[in-house]
Regions:
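Phosphate-binding/catalytic loop of phosphoryl-transfer enzymes
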Residues: 84, 98, 135-243, 361-372
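ATP-binding/phosphotransfer module of carbohydrate and carboxylate kinases, centering on a glycine-rich
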Residues: 1-60, 64-109, 113-130, 165, ...
């Protein structure tokens, strides 16, 4: 029977455990330096962690003076966490150890059967200690006060319930675009990016806002819900609720395509991928539509930049990642707002589940430290 920590760790043991989780492997002197603790204090902390079955020795390191020191890592019995991207058309998951090691991942295009995929994955983890926590990413606002919007709260609850996660496991829920922004912060390829906007353009639109390496959620959990921006903002026309998303989301793009496509343009494209593919091959009508769409997305980016001045906008989503969109967004942004770098996400469709995994790992380590 694996040993766990049924009660909170001492303050020093908690610090050492958290540092070892991020360092993956370390000696006691390295942990003492990382935690700014004395070597005797670290030794006592390590004894506590070893007794709890949370850490184990993993070889020996030899210094320049010839002295050797035991290397430690988290024990398998420390447990693992689960991250789920609960989309409307697909569900993906990752299970990771508390040191960040990937244990398993998979996806399905049958959301109503995702519980079976995830249940099987958890059964395969019986030798990896307890499941400490789960984070589920959803395509809705996650409300601090569910009474503020019971309809949205119920939709989120149903999405989580459909996964049939173990009842004893703490579950945190986060917006999918926010998760993608967290992934860009940690895995996007530039360790110096600490303030940026992740702008997702796909079936819907949304923004994840990171300021000083911290995700901005807002009072209602709705920071970045750009679908609610007033649109259109022009004389003689009243803005509609989420009208901007109706214009810039994939369904809106395809409605526009259908309204202007002519017989001489060839077969009507059935999805944005076809429109962009035709534009890439020099199709005049498709090229004009893509240019117009890029300009509209650029206006949205300019609105965000005018308020936040992030210095960097990262484009994501099925449409947002298309390179044909990027130049138009850059041109529009340059014409309307402050100097801002525009990049395309390199994480692709995995961004949301990667970000959820980072959150789950944070929660999991904290659960061990606090004895939750």
């Amino acid at each position: 029977m694996p040993k766990t920590a049924p009660s909170p760790l001492s303050e020093s043991a908690g610090e050492v455990f958290a540092q070892l989780a991020w360092l993956v492997r370390a000696t006691r002197p390295q942990l003492a330096a990382a935690c700014a603790l004395s070597k005797p204090t670290v030794s006592v902390a390590m004894s506590e962690l070893e007794a709890a079955g949370l850490v184990e020795r993993d070889g020996t390191a030899h210094g320049l003076t010839g002295r050797s020191a035991a290397v430690y890592r988290l024990a398998r019995e420390a447990g693992y966490v689960l991250a789920v991207d609960r989309g409307s058309t697909q569900v993906s998951f990752r299970t990771i150890a508390l040191d960040g090691s990937l244990l398993d991942e998979d996806q399905t295009s049958q959301p109503d059967r995702a519980w079976s995929m995830i249940g099987g994955a958890l059964e395969r983890r019986t030798g990896d200690g307890p499941l400490r926590t789960a984070v589920v990413a959803v395509s809705d606002v996650v409300l601090p006060d569910q009474a503020a919007d019971p309809t949205t709260a119920e939709r989120v609850a149903q999405a989580v319930t459909s996964l049939r996660l173990p009842q004893a496991v703490p579950v945190a829920v986060e917006n999918n675009v926010n998760c993608a922004a967290i992934a860009e912060l940690h895995d996007g390829g530039d360790e110096h990016r600490d303030t940026f906007v992740y702008l997702q353009v796909g079936v819907g639109i949304g923004a994840g806002i990171v300021i000083g390496r911290r995700l901005l959620r807002g009072r209602n959990g709705a920071a970045g819900e750009v679908a609610r921006l007033a649109y259109p903002w022009t004389d003689g026309r009243e803005p509609g609720r989420e009208a901007l998303e109706a214009r810039l989301g994939s369904p809106g793009l395809m409605r526009l395509v259908g309204s202007v496509w002519r017989n001489g343009d060839g077969p009507l494209p059935q999805d944005p991928e076809e429109v962009f593919a035709l534009a890439g091959r020099g199709h005049e009508r498709a090229g004009a539509l893509v240019a117009e769409h890029a300009g509209e997305v650029g206006k949205l980016a300019a609105s965000l930049v005018s308020v936040l001045d992030p210095g960097l906008v990262i484009l994501g989503g099925g449409v947002g990642r298309n390179p044909l969109l990027t130049d138009g967004v850059r041109r529009t942004l340059a014409a309307l707002s402050w100097p801002t770098k525009v990049e395309v996400s390199r994480l692709g469709e995995r961004a949301t589940v990667l970000g959820a995994a980072h959150l789950a790992r944070d929660h999991g380590v904290n659960a061990v430290v606090t004895g939750a």
